[in-house]
Amino acid sequence: MSLIHINIFLAFTVSLMGLLMYRSHLMSSLLCLEGMMLSLFIMATMMVLNSHFTLAIMMPIILLVFAACEAALGLSLLVMISNTYGMDYVQNLNLLQC
């Protein structure tokens, strides 16, 4: 395992730990999810470039499309919640009422 792979795995781990530890605001959770998706995209791109498998070239692009959809849905949910409740605290949201 090269140093680049270790750094990308460390970035994913730090983003995951940030998602698990700092769950107070929805915006910080969304940023941690974007960090995880970015590290997964870079890792998938490096795997495709190292394997020279032509059918797997679309995998990082599909992952990037899913990351963009996740970001758009997350930001629209953040705007809706902040307009409705006036705050974005995750602890105060009840899933049965939203």
Curated annotation (Swiss-Prot):
It catalyses: a ubiquinone + NADH + 5 H(+)(in) = a ubiquinol + NAD(+) + 4 H(+)(out). PANTHER family: NADH-UBIQUINONE OXIDOREDUCTASE CHAIN 4L, NADH-UBIQUINONE OXIDOREDUCTASE SUBUNIT ND4L. Its EC number is 7.1.1.2. It is an enzyme of class 7 (translocase). The gene is MT-ND4L. This is NADH-ubiquinone oxidoreductase chain 4L. It comes from the Eukaryota. Core subunit of respiratory chain NADH dehydrogenase (Complex I) which is composed of 45 different subunits. Keywords: Electron transport, Membrane, Mitochondrion, Mitochondrion inner membrane, NAD, Respiratory chain, Translocase, Transmembrane, Transmembrane helix, Transport, Ubiquinone. Belongs to the complex I subunit 4L family. GO terms for molecular function: NADH dehydrogenase (ubiquinone) activity.
